[in-house]
A protein has these predicted regions:
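Conserved flavin/dinucleotide-binding core of flavoenzymes
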Residues: 3-8, 51, 106-107, 304, ...
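N-terminal Rossmann-like FAD-binding beta1-loop-alpha1 element of flavoenzymes
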Residues: 11-38
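Short loop/edge segments at beta-strand edges and connector loops
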Residues: 17, 89-91, 230-233, 238, ...
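Conserved Rossmann-like nucleotide-cofactor binding loop
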Residues: 21, 44, 264
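Glycine-rich FAD pyrophosphate-binding loop
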Residues: 30-53
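Dinucleotide-binding Rossmann-like beta1-alpha1 core, especially the glycine-rich loop
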Residues: 55-132, 179
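Active-site/ligand-binding neighborhood in enzyme catalytic cores
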Residues: 117-243, 253, 260
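Mid-domain catalytic core of redox enzymes
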Residues: 235-351, 364-370, 449
């Protein structure tokens, strides 16, 4: 895209995107006395990790919870400026809506909770499952059927994941979700068949702010940052000239660029034919989240449940989450708040009426299920996440490796979940930014020493 030519503002380090990975990158640059500027396209910082308040309800963009594996608590996260006393650790309770029952998640480790005859069918299918495929060419669908049996795969695992990622699973590789998907662990599956409860999975506990929603994480990361510019939508990049042009015609020149914007979008505006071609093989799903405030407490059957997976293809949404079961600071005690997620393709979003068409369908489906009374609905706030889940197709790894290697030649370093085109947690995104920036700084210092 051709953009107006302005005198570039020369900045040694430019950070694209003001989400948690971009803010982490900026924080590390500032702490290391590096001159930088962060460019965020929206009016506020935070990316998808933002919170808004509507009618005394505190809504995140959708359910965003802090899962930690490297650090013991939020206060231990480097550069985040978080105080543990402002956060609550929650032991996850999630369920799967199958057979008109709420089955504890992960369902594959809790088969005994299934009603008859589904339980017997799943067990028989598991006992007669095909051999687990080690071939790297195996699809995600193959992985599920060989790992858990065809009945459970068809009942829950396949429809749930296809609704979420808006793509047939035979187009994804078995590496699609890596550590985020409960493994076909025979010991745990058989324990579940015997009725021994399991709360397995990577996120058996998580952290959430006592007040203020997940934007408390953003507030900690941005605290004290000096060079964060909002309303700076980058519309053109010249990798050869190392310049970025924003929609309001500001031009920035960099020595090093750290980008948290979706990798596919970065390549498409790069003016590099090789990058544009490689990015054409990358795909992703979108998510539309409906945040709903209710003038009533949650129904008793939802007591203590944090989120609920919904595999039934006749129901428009794939997950329902309950903010008010997670943090009481999300609404007043006499009310409740939930979020409802619908998967979509990027092509679906081209239909301008999509969100308006979906909203009444979602509300009516919730009422038909008996999960709310439409008369209790106080407000609905919809958010569209254009890039929600990146797809681990068989082409993804080769394409991403080529792209990252090529970008490095221009001193461009992608960071975070969407920058690196991966399926990662918030902790992973911050760690990706931290490691990438530190490595770039160390390389630059080594180069200066060698030059001297």
């Amino acid at each position: 895209m051709n953009a107006p030519v302005n005198t570039p503002r020369k900045i040694p380090a430019v950070v694209l995107g003001g989400g948690i990975s971009g803010l982490t990158a900026a924080r590390i640059l500032q702490e290391n006395s590096q001159e930088y500027v962060l460019l965020e396209r929206c009016p506020t910082l935070g990316g998808l990790t933002r919170t808004i308040e509507v009618n005394e309800y505190c809504f995140d963009y959708t359910g965003h919870f802090l899962h930690l594996s490297r650090y013991a608590s939020p206060g231990d996260i480097p550069y985040a400026n978080l105080r543990n006393e402002e956060w609550t650790q929650v032991r996850r309770r999630s369920c799967c809506f199958v057979g008109d029952k709420f089955i504890s998640a992960p369902i594959q480790y809790n088969l005994s909770e299934l009603p008859s005859p589904l339980f017997e069918q799943c067990v028989e299918s598991y006992e007669n499952r095909p051999a687990l495929l080690d071939d790297d060419c195996a699809t995600f669908r193959d992985y599920l059927v060989s790992g858990f049996g065809a009945v459970l795969a068809d009942l829950f695992l396949i429809p749930q994941n296809e609704k979420t990622m808006a793509i047939p699973l035979d187009r994804l590789s078995k590496r699609a979700v890596r550590r985020f998907f409960p493994a076909p662990d025979e010991t745990l599956v058989r324990a579940g068949i015997r009725g021994e409860p399991s709360n397995g999975g990577y996120n058996s506990t998580f952290w959430y702010p006592k007040v203020g929603g997940i934007s408390r994480l953003v507030a900690g990361l941005r605290s004290g940052l000096e060079e964060c510019l909002v309303n700076q939508d980058v519309i053109a990049l010249s990798l050869r000239n190392r310049t970025a042009v924003t929609k309001n015609t500001a031009t920035f020149s960099w020595d090093t660029l750290f980008s948290s914007m979706p990798l596919k979008a970065l390549c498409e505006m790069s003016e590099d034919d090789g990058l544009v071609s490689a990015a054409a093989s990358l795909s992703h799903s979108s998510t539309i989240s409906f945040n709903i405030g209710l003038r009533a407490p949650l129904r008793p059957e939802f007591s203590g449940i944090h989120w609920l997976y919904v595999p039934d293809r006749r129901i428009p949404f794939y997950r329902v989450g309950f903010y008010s079961n997670i943090g009481r600071g999300t609404c007043t005690p006499d009310r409740s708040s939930i979020y409802v997620e619908v998967g979509a393709t990027p092509e679906d979003l081209e239909r301008t009426t999509l969100v308006a068409d979906l909203q009444p369908m979602v509300i009516l489906a919730l009422q038909d299920l008996g999960w709310l009374d439409i008369r209790d609905v106080d407000c609905v706030v919809a958010h569209t996440m254009r890039c929600a889940y990146v797809h681990h197709t068989p082409q993804r790894d080769t394409a991403v490796k080529y792209i990252l290697d090529r970008l490095r030649e221009y001193q461009v370093f992608p960071i975070g979940r969407y920058g690196t085109w991966d399926y990662t947690s918030m902790e992973d995104s911050m760690e990706s930014a931290r490691q990438t920036v530190m490595e770039a700084l160390q390389t630059a210092m080594t180069g200066q020493v060698d030059a001297a």
